[in-house]
Amino acid sequence: VAGVLQNGTTYSKSRDNSTPIVFAGIPYDFKYQFSEQFVKAGDNSINSGRLQMRNFEISYDRTGFFEVEVSPKPYDNRLRKIFTRTFTGRRIGSLFLGKQELDTGVFRVPVYVNSKDVKITVLSDSWLPLSLQSADYEAFQVLRNQRI
């Protein structure tokens, strides 16, 4: 493919490439907010104590672009900074001029907030494909009291 066309209606290919890969799409707004994270013991959840989140990992497959927002309480950028981390699908050693790469892997985002006081949101306004597979978290669970 000759390159990425933003508002074009045609594309051209080089003579030596008989089967080019072409990405065509309409930009759309994607937003997914994860629910509150908690620890489960069997069929019950453990709601007592404090679950201090450290990292959040999102598994993706053949994805081109997305952003992850970590919004601690209060959820307003004027009162507390909203942390944003961007995934572009580009890795060192895999970049070629005029070629859009899709990547598969795990995207890690630092959180460092109590699980009850944070919103974790995945956003995308790109025409590139986005395929989220799963999400995991790393956290400390501190129980305040326990029956003996």
What is the predicted role of each segment?
Residues 1-148:
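Beta-sheet repeat architectures centered on beta-propellers
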